Amino acid sequence: MNPTRARQGPDVGGPGSVLRLFIVSFASLYVEVLLIRWLGTEFRVFAYIQNLTLVACFLGFGLGCLQSSAPPKHLFNFRALTILVLIVDLPIREWKRILDAVVSGLAVNSDFSVWAMPTERVAVVNFLAAAAMVSGILLLVIATMIPLGAWVASCLESSERIVTAYSVNLLGSLIGVWGFAGLSFLDLPPIVWFAIAFALLLFMQPRVRDIGLAGALTLLACLAVLEMGHGSSVKTVWSPYQKLEVHRGEDDQYEITVNNSGYMTIANLTPELLERDPRLRDQYAAGNSYDTPYRFASQLDNVLIVGSGAGNDVAAALRNGAGHIDAVEIDPIIYGFGRELHPEKPYQSSKVRAVLDDARDFMRRSTNRYDLIVFGLLDSHTQSSSLSNMRIDNYVYTRESFEDAKRLLKPAGVLVIKFEVRSPHAWMGQRFHSMLSQIFSHSPVAFYCAQVMALVPASVFIESQDTSLWNRASSPELAKFVADHPLPYAISDHPDAEPTTDDWPYLYHRSRTIPKMYLSVSGILILLGYLLVRKSFSYRQARTWEFFFLGAGFLLLETQMVSRLALYFGSTWVVNCVVLTFVLLVLIAANVAVDRFKRIPLGPVYLSLVVSLLAIYSLPWTRLPLGTRAVGLLLGMAFSLPLFFAGIIFTESFRRAGGAAKVLGANILGAVAGGLAQNFSFVFGVKALLIVAAVFYAIAGLIRAFTRNAQPIQSANAIASSA
């Protein structure tokens, strides 16, 4: 046996090598998705900068590939993961506050809206402390992935049939994605996720007994910390989207926190409680963001509530006499909390039809007409997928989404947009006002409702195609209410906030710039990447750069597919898993094609790839005279072409290159660059990433064309043998 391989972990030779490659590939994707989901929940920086964990995982995996001939010591990633858990999930309140303060430390101005954003400029010392904390967490993520990259690379490099081995790698990755998705579907907590992850990491160690007593105790401490992270909550559940905790309040009311931040309440406005508390009754009668909008509607026969949450908006609709209510909520656990805990039992009413779906997807497909449509304080504290830089509510607050809502209104129907606009982000309220004015050709009725007991405050914007809305709004009673409840910020006819569209859906970004917090964190990643790979990356070999740009282009292609198809099928976790499955299956099909032919000329394939990307960019998909699902299927089929071509190019180049570990490492590091290049969408829009991907692939093609006779990259094991 090669002594170098013996140090690397899993034995890559022998009859069980295929199974070992499958297990290592499964573990790599499983741990990657786990870190993306968990860090985005427990450390808010990783929730707001959605693909940060993904890029760090790629950096660690790629570095491991480059260093597969000199792998890290035993239990290297096991120790890194245990330290990461202990740092991030330590159940000490003061420590949690320090972690939350990291967001404020990195948020150097108000060009990007996050909760707990400071209104004053951030001190340099606070910024440096926050940057150091983020750097430490990123290093632990990278360290966790390094051995996994080394093991996968060494398995591939030892294989006699590289294309078959790569197919096994893809299949293991596919099962890893669905393995974690299954745990999310069952609402299992992180202690289960990490128990499986630690078991996988220990299983792949060459000498498990090296863990020792200290390692075993550390593992138990990690699991204990994960189990202790529930605090004082009545119930803690990990839904497919987020961590949800229920805290009991007074008068049969509850607070629901999402990813450790206050999110929503379950209010009690039953007649019995109002009769017992005259002060509360008077506050309620004076007006609130839930009940007051119904006073502006002429009819309430058919009501749509998107983002119905735990049922407060549904209860308000029932209190105000709605005949039928379609209540749309994306998170089944939040809906379950409302059904179980809401004192008014709104979801049990025969007038209510609950729909578990993405709000935008429902509106695009619905053919119903409504007297009132309410956007029920949708606000995302998390993301559905860290494979793109989208939040789950990104496509809900775009011009096209408001136009979908307008289409669903009856001739005299009323649209209500509620949003909690916080200082210093008045530009968000100005954006809503301006967009609605343009869509309805009339300024909306706008007012602000303060908090009433558990009913949260909100800026309220009311629009209609029918002028009777303004006749009602000018009645003495409603006119006085609007005058007494002005918005707490000025409304400008020319707001400096960019209108959001399906191509630029960044509600929480002020303008077409890369927010300073993103630039700060990207700078940290670039610096870490340079320091870690400068001695391993073969800068002077042309093939290295070819695979680098292939990786950059593919990451953009994959994330573009995830974000674009979310428009047609919804931003649900099932959709994301199906899209990733489709991507991996297309790549496996490309492997089969490469395996059937001895040599494929890559010039025409490169040309076809670039042309197909430009075609997807140019076609007016939203104008096709087809249903939403039909257009989505056509777009998915269109994306399969560049995916297939990209798969053929990579696999054929991989087969010819030699030095599987080195080229795979370069490819993964290119994906890191592609992840950072996603930030360009904040300036140029989502579609523009297709052009960037085409440029990356064109550069890779030119490198191949001009270095056709270049020597193959020397394998990592060959380098080790000659040393």
Predicted regions and their residues:
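Alpha-helical transmembrane segments of multi-pass membrane proteins
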Residues: 1-723
